[in-house]
């Protein structure tokens, strides 16, 4: 466990608040995550559970969460820590994303993921949310005008446009 993770990069800004609510000397455990979920009070019924404490039902990962509210969360694991962090920071977005997976399953004619679930998985694992209030900047982004967006308009970042890490696999 590295308690200094939160200060090591601005990438962690959206989830940095967790560092003030988790033990400094050890990995957070399922009880810590559940206490934070209750503190957030946005998605009732979500719990973080060790995978070995869940019966093997043969369900997709997302189906289990949708049906039971139990998010499989391995102990002492950065990937699952960051997944829990995103659930705790953006609970309504994660719930909506989980619902997209369920819709994708219902509209798929095979056991494969399909395009809707593929897109949901990409956002969940490696997504960046770009929030903006200046349409010109959004247009520069869409047109891949990187020099204009990132260099000429650098002063706008953090003021009228922001990139927020959402995908837990890229933290």
Residue ranges with predicted function:
Residues 103-171:
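A contiguous, surface-oriented mixed alpha/beta subdomain in the mid-to-C-terminal portion of proteins
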Residues 54, 88-92, 129, 147:
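Short loop/turn segments at secondary-structure transitions that flank enzyme active sites
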Residues 50-51, 84, 132-133:
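Short His-Asn-centered micro-motif
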Residues 1-68, 159-171:
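The feature captures two recurrent sequence modes
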Residues 59, 76-84, 117-120, 135:
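Non-catalytic, well-ordered alpha-helical scaffold segments
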Residues 21, 36-39, 64, 85, ...:
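Residues that form generic nucleotide/phosphate-binding pockets
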